[in-house]
Each structure stands twice: as structure tokens, then as C-alpha cells.
Amino acid sequence: MESRKVTTQHLVKGEDLNHHGTLFAGRAAEWFVEAGFLAAAVWVPTENIVLVKINSMTFSRPVKRGAVLRLESEVVRAGRTSLEARIEGSAGGDVSLEGSITFVSVDAEGKPMPHGISALLQM
């Protein structure tokens, strides 16, 4: 399978912190979903992608103010209408969060439609 990884980076600022002074999970989730969306957008037009499920999002260490959180994402599985993206976030070289999300390709009425990329992912 051809690798089509997408990398995004975010500077963790004061407004991104929780009451413990570390990256707020809600902000991390926003960036996490955005990274997965960008990976899906490599394969499917953005107007056809909707989030169905955050399968998992696990934090393994806190991310502190001033850190640069690097999120790497790629589509790892495709069904007839769905795509699963795997995301890994690291700060200072250490993995801080990881997980996966599922998107579905939809038509103009919001109904699931085949995306036609399954064969490409098998290459």
C-alpha cells in the first residue's frame, strides 16, 4: 500500500491548557480529528467526508505549554463507503497520544456513497 501520511503541527499555547497546565483534551481532540480529516482528504474530496466515530484516542503522557505537538495521520483501512485514519501525536519526539477515527463518504444529501478507493489502498 502506498503511504500517504499527512503531518500537522500545533504550538501549545496558554489558551490550549486545562486546569493542570497541560494540553486540554478537548483541544487535542479537535486537532486529532482535523489530522484524520486531512488524511482522508488525500483520498476523498473534502465535501464528501463526514466523521462517524472516534474509535480511540489515548493519551500516554501530558503535553506542556510551549511544546510543538506533531500529528501524523494516514488512512489505514477502507470499506465500501468508510475510511479509517490512524493518528499519532508526539511532542519533543515522545508519543503523547494515538488512536483512530472513522469517516464515511457521503453524497450531496448526506447519504453514504462508495468512495471507490478500496482498490487503491490494496496496492
Regions found by a protein language model. Name each.
Residues 2-7, 64-65, 76-123:
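HotDog/MaoC-like acyl-thioester-processing domains
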Residues 37-83, 94-99:
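Hydrophobic beta-strand-centered segment that forms part of the acyl-chain substrate-binding groove
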Residues 9-13, 58, 102:
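Generic structural detector for well-ordered beta-strands
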Residues 1-53, 107-123:
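Hot-dog-fold acyl-thioester-processing enzymes
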